[in-house]
Amino acid sequence: MYDIKKWRHIFKLDPAKHISDDDLDAICMSQTDAIMIGGTDDVTEDNVIHLMSRVRRYPLPLVLEISNIESVMPGFDFYFVPTVLNSTDVVFHNGTLLEALKTYGHSIDFEEVIFEGYVVCNADSKMAKHTKANTDLTTEDLEAYAQMVNHMYRLPVMYIEYSGIYGDVSKVQAVSEHLTETQLFYGGGISSEQQATEMAAIADTIIVGDIIYKDIKKALKTVKIKESSK
C-alpha cells in the first residue's frame, strides 16, 4: 500500500478532456507522486475507464476522486471522497457518500478510501457552482474549517480548492498552521514552477491540473518542487 503522507505532488487528469499519448507519457514519467483522475463535468464510466487503462501502464499510484456514483469502478489504488464543507447543499456533504455506501458498502475496502474535507474558494469555478459552495470566506472562516477537519472530524486530508485561479497564499498559510494531523492539499491555478514552489512550501501536497492542457512544459516544471524539502 502506498503512503499518501509522502506525496508532495499530484497531477490531476480530467477524463472529459483530451490528452495525447505523448503528453500523457511525459506526465506519468515526470516523477510526480501520483495521478488523480477527476473532474466536475461529463465524468462518465466510459471516459474514466478509458483514461484509467491508459495510465495503468505506468508504475505509479492511481487515484479516482469521486464526483458521481456512476463513474466508480475497481482498479484504482485509492478512492478520494470529497465532503464539501462550505457547500449549502447536504448532498455535497455526505449525500454522494451515502449513495456510494448503499450501493457498494458491502464490497468497499476502506483502506483504499480517503475522505477529503474540501473547501471551495473560487466563486466563478464550475466546482463552486456545481456544489453550491459559499465562497465568501474570511481567513477566520478557513481557520475554523481547519480546526473542524483536524480536531473534530479528524479527516486525513483537507483540500483547499481554488479551481482555475491561483489562491490567496496568506489564507492557505493560515489553514496550514491549524493542521497538526490532517494532510493539507492545495489545488488551483498553479501554472509555473514559482507558484508550485510557493504553495509547496505551505501545503503538504500540491495538485496540478489545468496547466497540463494549456502548456505541458510548464506543467512538467512544477514537479521540480520535489527536489526541495518542505
Curated annotation (Swiss-Prot):
Molecular function (Gene Ontology), one example: heptaprenylglyceryl phosphate synthase activity
Keywords: Lipid biosynthesis, Lipid metabolism, Magnesium, Metal-binding, Phospholipid biosynthesis, Phospholipid metabolism, Transferase
Top-level class of the enzyme under EC nomenclature: transferase
Cofactor names: Mg(2+)
Quaternary structure and partners: Homodimer.
Lineage: Bacteria, Bacillati, Bacillota, Bacilli, Bacillales
InterPro entries: GGGP/HepGP_synthase_I (IPR039074), GGGP/HepGP_synthase_sf (IPR038597), GGGP_HepGP_synthase (IPR008205)
Catalytic activity: sn-glycerol 1-phosphate + all-trans-heptaprenyl diphosphate = 3-heptaprenyl-sn-glycero-1-phosphate + diphosphate
Residues that coordinate or bind sn-glycerol 1-phosphate: K12, Y159, I160, E161, Y162, S163, G164, G189, G209, D210
Entry binding sites for Mg(2+): D14, T40
This protein's record includes keyword S-adenosyl-L-methionine: no
Pathway: Membrane lipid metabolism; glycerophospholipid metabolism
GO biological processes: glycerophospholipid biosynthetic process
Similarity field: Belongs to the GGGP/HepGP synthase family. Group I subfamily.
Free-text function comment from the UniProt entry: Prenyltransferase that catalyzes in vivo the transfer of the heptaprenyl moiety of heptaprenyl pyrophosphate (HepPP; 35 carbon atoms) to the C3 hydroxyl of sn-glycerol-1-phosphate (G1P), producing heptaprenylglyceryl phosphate (HepGP). This reaction is an ether-bond-formation step in the biosynthesis of archaea-type G1P-based membrane lipids found in Bacillales.
Protein name: Heptaprenylglyceryl phosphate synthase
